[in-house]
Amino acid sequence: MTYIENIFLCMVSPLLVAALCMGRRQLRFFLFCIAGMGVCLLSAYINTFLAAVCQADALAATVEIAPVVEEMMKLLPLVFYLLVFEPEGDKIKAAAITVALAFATFENVCYLIQNGADRFSFIFFRGFGTGAVHVLCGLIVGGGLAYTWQRTWLKIAGTCGLLGAAITLHAIYNLLIAYGGAAQYVAYALPVLLVAAGKLSAFRLSQRK
């Protein structure tokens, strides 16, 4: 049995100390890191609870429950940030990526502790794939929120649409992982390639301007 709350405390403790030492300018980054790990911890409990209530098998829990719960939980700190502080667009995107990155990091650490780290090649691809899919979902949601929350009539519909897009992408990723075999490695490579393609497109657009 993996006591993920103990892992959470061990990972959050140095972040809290660093947040106190770095001052107010860097405080937001550390708080969103802690929030990302916190919602990952809560997502694990909620996933387990819903899987038990719905009597879902491993595939259903992975493809139907986990993507919905995890993406909704990652959205909560961002919505709170938007409602309370009304930040600028760049800050929204940075916050979304930080939450997603911390979520993926905590998830990977828990996976390593539970399953071992003896298979380097598999762990290498999984680390990049899981990190990239969460960051990609964070980019979709963060970039979209920066646009939709500047327009009152788009706030609710836009947020729901972005959440749906992130859930769909996450569910496809989990489905390929659950299928196994070559599809598993396609899933690991796909988000990395999408992030790289997005950055390349953004770079070319900036060069044209």
Regions found by a protein language model. Give the residues of each.
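Hydrophobic alpha-helical segments at protein termini of multi-pass membrane proteins
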Residues: 1-209
